[in-house]
């Protein structure tokens, strides 16, 4: 059974998703628990393959139907893809359980449809990170996209329009990637990624390869909401179903970023002119994302919309880390993918909890959040501090590695941008003028908000501190000091804004809110929602405390060959 763990990561949630509606017909809750159980099994398999790759020091190759590549499709799991699989399945499991209270009043068809789409979204995301075949990646990309469109459309109000807009733009992105695959296949005659890496060498300076890279870059840029290709994201995050929004916002844009990493650093290599040019463009767009995303967040009054634009800025951090082009910049980018997934998921979990309890997320009617939802407020605070980059949160270390890489590469401009991007969070990440007193009603949510805010600022020992640390370290070693300045300024902006969040939650008077789902006690939410929020908050701290171990024992063991020479 253990040897089949790679395929079970995808097969378990796929089977459960296909059977979900049938089981829900007999018992409306049975199908949902089937999907939740399958995701738990997928998480167990992901942990197993991660342990196996780390102990053996070798990548796992699983041939589908025992067809040897390059003719057959294979799953390839190295430390990086295994970490991504664990990240996806863990957050997926948390959010799947978290969604249960939202479904209590729904009929079997609605519940079954929701969890069918949710299971398929997990399948698509997991498949994208473990497949070793270019066309197979496209198939999983479409599975991810179609299920994501459906979950967004289930959010009500303007969600159908948001999903339709995302579908139109997302289809362009997927089509561009498919065109890229066609060009690469025409040049090399293979779809296997490892085989492609060997056969593409004579074409690395050719115009068809440049066109293929451009299509791949734009296609995945759309999917990861890279500035200025992010137009679909604000409405998609804002109107997505509150149960699934944390999974969509936390993970869905990170997997396309991983795909760019896989192609540029592991298959093509970064030492040829075309990829170097692409990384330079990526860095420029990353700078634009940090600045424009921050500015746009300042102008928002809707909680989710602010977080959507902040995600544009955070994707900019990842882009800058990759553009720095050295080991520490790379580590900072990957670490920020992991940390931001937890931080953003934590924030959206709390938002969903507020919406579940009060029926609204109007920032001017949530006074006293720290008194009503204390744990949620603390978690948001930790996430915010981590995103700002306050040590020892995880966000600090990812930004630190970005800055160090920029410094070592002599790219000081990136440092300036990273600093500016962090400062924006003080003014535009989450405007909580009406969150006073919520800690009394939703203690767990308040704690979670506090943790998330601290992590987003970058307060140690949360996760956000460490990701920013590695980003700065990469910029420093690369001599790219501008990146370091950008990281520092962005962190200051984060700090200014998120400390204001704490002021609103813990100091301001309570606002008059009508509770549509009343829950007494410190948790302030049903256990199915409180436990995932608590796990997200703890995850931010764990990623911070063990950031060095994650980098040394996991990420460095899966570095691209270019950094090992």
Regions found by a protein language model. Name each.
Residues 227, 344-348, 408-409, 413-417, ...:
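Predominantly late transmembrane helices and immediately cytosolic-facing juxtamembrane segments
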Residues 1-7, 18-116, 194-198, 556-561:
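Transmembrane helix-loop-helix hairpins at membrane boundaries of multipass inner-membrane proteins
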Residues 76, 126-132, 188, 262-278, ...:
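Helix-coil boundary and interhelical linker segments in multi-pass alpha-helical membrane proteins
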Residues 17-27, 94-106, 149-158, 162, ...:
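C-terminal ends of transmembrane helices
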Residues 65-83, 198-212, 276-280, 408-413, ...:
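Short aromatic-rich membrane-water interface segments that cap or initiate transmembrane helices
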Residues 162, 216-281, 308-309, 394:
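Short helix-boundary/re-entrant hairpin motifs in multi-pass inner-membrane proteins
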Residues 240, 373, 432, 439-446, ...:
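Cytoplasmic/organellar membrane-interface segments at the starts of transmembrane helices
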Residues 26, 113-120, 124-208, 222, ...:
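Alpha-helical multi-pass transmembrane bundles of energy-transducing inner-membrane proteins
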């Amino acid at each position: 059974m253990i040897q089949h763990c790679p395929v079970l990561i995808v097969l378990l949630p796929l089977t459960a998703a296909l059977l979900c509606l049938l089981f829900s017909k007999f018992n409306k809750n049975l199908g949902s628990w089937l999907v939740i159980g399958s995701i738990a099994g997928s998480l167990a398999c992901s942990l197993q393959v991660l342990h196996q790759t780390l102990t053996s020091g070798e990548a796992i190759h699983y041939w589908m139907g025992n067809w040897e590549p390059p003719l057959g499709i294979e799953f390839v799991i190295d430390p990086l893809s295994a970490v991504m699989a664990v990240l996806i399945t863990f957050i997926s499991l948390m959010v799947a359980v978290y969604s249960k209270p939202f479904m209590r009043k729904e009929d079997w068809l609605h519940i079954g449809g929701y969890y069918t789409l949710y299971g398929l979204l997990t399948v698509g995301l997991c498949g994208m990170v473990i497949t070793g075949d270019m066309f197979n990646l496209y198939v999983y990309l479409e599975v991810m996209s179609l299920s994501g469109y459906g979950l967004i459309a289930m959010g009500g109000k303007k969600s159908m329009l948001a999903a339709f807009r995302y579908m139109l733009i997302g289809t362009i992105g997927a089509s561009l990637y498919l065109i890229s695959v066609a060009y690469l296949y025409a040049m090399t005659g293979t779809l296997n990624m490892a085989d492609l890496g060997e056969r593409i060498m004579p074409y690395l300076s050719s115009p068809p390869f440049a066109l293929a890279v451009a299509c791949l870059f734009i296609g995945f840029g759309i999917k990861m909401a890279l500035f200025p290709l992010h137009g679909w994201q604000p409405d998609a995050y804002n109107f997505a179903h509150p149960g699934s929004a944390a999974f969509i916002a936390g993970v869905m844009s990170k997997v396309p970023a991983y795909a760019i990493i896989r192609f540029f650093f592991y298959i093509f290599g970064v030492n040829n002119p075309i990829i170097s040019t692409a990384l330079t463009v990526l860095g420029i767009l990353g700078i634009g994302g940090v600045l424009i995303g921050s500015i746009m967040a300042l102008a928002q009054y809707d909680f989710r919309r602010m977080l959507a634009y902040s995600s544009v800025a955070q994707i900019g951090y990842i882009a800058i880390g990759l553009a720095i082009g050295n080991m520490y910049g790379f580590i900072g980018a990957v670490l920020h993918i992991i940390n931001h997934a937890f931080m953003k998921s934590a924030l959206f979990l709390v938002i969903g909890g507020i919406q579940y309890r009060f029926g609204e997320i109007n920032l001017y009617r949530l006074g006293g959040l720290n008194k009503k939802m204390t744990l949620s407020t603390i978690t948001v605070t930790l996430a915010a501090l981590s995103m700002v980059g306050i040590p020892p949160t995880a966000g600090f270390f990812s930004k630190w590695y970005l800055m160090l890489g920029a410094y070592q590469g002599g790219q000081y401009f990136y440092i300036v941008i990273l600093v500016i991007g962090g400062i924006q969070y003080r003014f535009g990440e989450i405007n909580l003028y009406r969150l006073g007193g919520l800690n009394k009603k939703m203690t767990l949510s308040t704690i979670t908000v506090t943790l998330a805010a601290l992590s987003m600022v970058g307060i140690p020992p949360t996760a956000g501190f460490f990701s920013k640390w590695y980003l700065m370290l990469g910029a420093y070693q690369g001599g790219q000091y501008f990146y370091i300045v950008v990281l520092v300024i962005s962190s200051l902006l984060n700090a200014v804004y998120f400390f204001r969040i704490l002021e609103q939650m813990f100091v301001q008077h309570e606002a008059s809110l009508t509770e549509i789902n009343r829950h007494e006690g410190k948790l302030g939410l049903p256990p199915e929602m409180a436990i995932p929020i608590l796990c997200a908050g703890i995850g931010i701290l764990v990623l911070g405390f063990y950031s060095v171990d994650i980098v040394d024992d996991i990420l460095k063991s899966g570095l691209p060959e270019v950094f090992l020479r």
